[in-house]
């Protein structure tokens, strides 16, 4: 499995010979160090606990040449470490996509530096800092991708793969920080339309984040569709509302959906998952975006898949941008 990370590696930064990286090389995560590197590492997971840094050019070329139609970037949430959580969840997503259509999608995790000690509250604050610091690193990643695409996706040899993003929980803070850094440092005129769908699941950002003038304002211009999955009984969101840097209590996007739908762009959709989120992730109801305990695709995954397949958001009535997601939706959409 290909992946990208800005976690500190035990082997240190990528060694260079002149301006050329000395890759491939075997690497491993330094899990005791949650500093956010300002460099990103393009890697492959060979098996559990075995990773190879292959470098940006090889990574992007391999991704382009894969016999897949679309790319699914997965940005994980708070307090997730690579092997206990991130890679198994990415493998689950890959398996569910393969069940829908073998060979259609490749899942690529983007791994930022979560903390692994000191208790949940300190971990939460540390992870907030790491997400903000990671924004610059992943903004540089975006620029590298645009530069690579300019020289390697030509009329003679185009890269036609659509790109989708799923950000879960605090991963949405990484997304917000990344896009804000892209505009601040690289593209002052705004984000280009690069992504097919951006799925924001249990988003741990304020519920005004997507409005003009807010820190997440650059997310919706970057995608054809932005889908916000939220649940009022997501217990992690209730705790997050008060456990934030600066002691500012604010309702979360993953708890209520957008505060003012009329203020966000018309490509933003809010999906109420309150009917089933605790069925998939009891009792907290926070990690409900993939499958059930039997390995079947869940409602959110089925909805994401329909959006990926069609490029459109199924809704009833057609003009509605706020949707109650339940089994009735699934039956009516078939």
Indicate residue ranges for each PLM-predicted region.
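"Short basic amphipathic alpha-helical interaction patches in structured regions
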Residues: 84-94
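Lipolytic serine-hydrolase domain surface
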Residues: 1-50, 65, 79-80, 91, ...
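Short beta-strand element of the alpha/beta-hydrolase
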Residues: 69-77
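Residue in the alpha/beta-hydrolase core beta-strand immediately N-terminal to the catalytic nucleophile
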Residues: 164, 168-169, 199
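Short beta-strand-to-loop junctions in surface cap/lid or active-site-entrance loops
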Residues: 58-67
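Gly/Ala-rich beta-loop-alpha elbow adjacent to hydrolase catalytic centers
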Residues: 138, 167, 171, 175
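Histidine-centered divalent metal-coordination motifs
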Residues: 76, 168, 286
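Gly/Ser/Thr-rich loops at beta-strand to alpha-helix junctions
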Residues: 77-82, 172
